[in-house]
Swiss-Prot record:
Homodimer and heterodimer. Able to interact with SPRED2 to form heterodimers. Interacts (via C-terminus) with TAOK1/MARKK (via C-terminus); the interaction does not affect TAOK1 kinase activity. Interacts (via C-terminus) with TESK1 (via C-terminus); the interaction inhibits TESK1 kinase activity. Interacts with CAV1. Interacts with RAS. Interacts with palmitoyltransferase ZDHHC17/HIP14; the interaction leads to palmitoylation of SPRED1. Palmitoylated by ZDHHC17/HIP14. This is Sprouty-related, EVH1 domain-containing protein 1. One of its GO terms (cellular component) is cytoplasm. Tyrosine kinase substrate that inhibits growth-factor-mediated activation of MAP kinase. Negatively regulates hematopoiesis of bone marrow. Inhibits fibroblast growth factor (FGF)-induced retinal lens fiber differentiation, probably by inhibiting FGF-mediated phosphorylation of ERK1/2. Attenuates actin stress fiber formation via inhibition of TESK1-mediated phosphorylation of cofilin. Inhibits TGFB-induced epithelial-to-mesenchymal transition in lens epithelial cells. It comes from Mus musculus. It is a peripheral membrane protein. CDD domains: EVH1_SPRED-like. Expressed in brain. Weakly expressed in lung, heart, liver, kidney, intestine, spleen, testis, thymus, colon and ovary. Also expressed in embryonic tissues such as heart, lung, liver and brain. Highly expressed in IL3-dependent hematopoietic cell lines (Ba/F3 and MC/9) and bone marrow-derived mast cells (BMMC). One of its GO terms (molecular function) is protein serine/threonine kinase inhibitor activity.
């Protein structure tokens, strides 16, 4: 595999983090840096095949930052065994090879874990991305034809003049046509649409449909010359609802949220509601000081009489409304520790579990919990060097009783270990009150 293939487009990347690449040393029973120490850029990515229906290959590639040397390059398989030992150290096994990563923060570890899971799901499904692209190409022509037919039907049904207003919807403003006229128009439109020649290219379809619509408009405008002046009472009124809004999607925000925590979907909902409110486009009433937009139809006398009533206008949203809404929501930023969005006004202590907590670290050192972890590592760890949390209450662990008996025996030698549980309970009460715990920190 060449370097150009490995460093392909970001669209094929599932995760990109910075970590120290580790390997298992069976002789010493520990983990050592692979290819020497140093921080590396580790990427989980997909390499598509050249064939149309060929499935892609998935790789994990690690490149050391200081000298651009590739220290890790392995292919993902379905039988991958992935273990999350600590919040900042994960390791996996493929065939007989064992690799591990020491991350800079728990947020990077979670992002890498999600990327691995997504890649394994795509391997199990059998390359769904390529199937989607193949199906999308076959439906392009059918979608273009449906859009063209829909535009022709819409043009014939709204042959009367249209006035756009901002008044609330009233059922008396719209006068539906009789049932017989609707059936007659439907038969006429079906016969007209069936006569339109559709080519294979989308541009030819669009140009021919526009020519057809222009011919129909010129015929209708020519027939209006022989008729008398149409009164304003026959004008059809169309009202736009105030609730209709346009949703704007920020691609930069989507890329950032790619590694966001999936456990908090409410943040997406709040952001979309705020964007929808700010992007609404109201329609104003007629104003003689602003320009009017009309279509030339050939009948100058009729257009001059309807010029003051047929007006299309748009105005930008009110800045006062936007500033008021943002003030109510508060300023929001993204945390550098957990990569989640937070409100500065509600950023109290204990809100971020990944932020450094000096009080918790002090409790850990004062109660000598390092002695308990050392005992568990040397006496109760598995072949990979993993062991349970010293104070874990998970009864499913096969060494649950043995672990607690060992901790009780160790507490007679190191009495300060007995202070860990009451100090930890006080710390949790302080987190609930907002006195202890880590705080979010805005990026940048």
């Amino acid at each position: 595999m060449s370097e150009e293939t490995a460093t392909s487009d970001n669209d094929n990347s599932y995760a990109r983090v910075r970590a120290v690449v580790m390997t298992r040393d069976d002789s010493s029973g520990g983990w050592l840096p692979l290819g020497g120490s140093g921080l590396s850029s580790v990427t989980v990515f997909r390499v598509p095949h050249q064939e149309e229906n060929g499935c892609a290959d998935f790789f994990i590639r690690g490149e050391r930052l200081r000298d651009k040397m590739v220290v890790l390059e392995c292919m993902l398989k379905k039988d991958l065994i992935y273990n999350k030992v600590t919040p900042t150290f994960h390791h996996w096994k493929i065939d007989d090879k064992k690799f591990g990563l020491t991350f800079q923060s728990p947020a990077d570890a979670r992002a890498f874990d999600r990327g691995i899971r997504r890649a394994i799901e795509d391997i199990s499904l059998g390359c769904p991305a390529s199937k989607t692209e193949a199906e999308g190409g076959d439906d392009d022509l059918q979608t273009t034809e449906e859009d063209t037919s829909r535009s022709l039907v819409k043009d014939h049904f709204f042959q009367q003049e249209t006035v756009v207003t901002s008044e609330p919807y009233r059922s008396s403003d719209i006068r539906p046509l009789p049932f017989e006229d609707l059936n007659a128009r439907r038969v006429y439109l079906q016969s007209q649409v069936s006569q339109i020649p559709f080519s294979q290219q989308g541009l030819d379809i669009q140009s021919r449909s526009m020519e057809y619509v222009q011919r129909q408009i010129s015929k209708e405008c020519g027939s209006l010359k022989s008729q008398t002046r149409v009164p304003l009472k026959s004008i059809r009124h169309v009202s736009f609802q105030d609730e209709d809004e346009i949703v704007r999607i920020n691609p930069r925000d989507i890329l950032i949220r790619r590694y966001a925590d999936y456990r908090h979907p409410d943040m997406w909902k709040n952001d979309l509601e705020r964007d929808d409110t700010d992007s609404s486009v109201p329609f104003s009433k007629q104003d003689s000081k602003k320009s009017d937009y009309l279509y030339h139809c050939g009948d100058e006398t009729k257009l001059s009489s309807l010029k003051d009533s047929v007006v299309f206008k748009t105005q930008p949203p009110s800045l006062k409304f936007k500033s008021k809404r943002r003030k109510e929501d508060g300023e929001r930023s993204r945390c550098v520790y957990c990569q989640e969005r937070f409100n500065h006004e509600e950023n109290a202590r204990g809100k971020c579990q990944d932020a450094p907590d000096p009080v918790k670290r002090c409790i850990y050192q004062v109660s000598c919990m390092l002695c308990a972890e050392s005992m568990l590592y040397h006496c109760m760890s598995d072949s990979e060097g993993d062991f349970s949390d010293p104070c874990s209450c998970d009864t499913s662990d096969d060494k649950f009783c043995l672990r607690w008996l060992a901790l009780v025996a160790l507490s007679f030698i190191v009495p300060c270990m007995c202070c860990y549980v009451p100090l930890r309970m006080c710390h949790r009460c302080g987190e609930a009150c907002g006195c202890c715990g880590g705080k979010h920190k805005a990026a940048g």
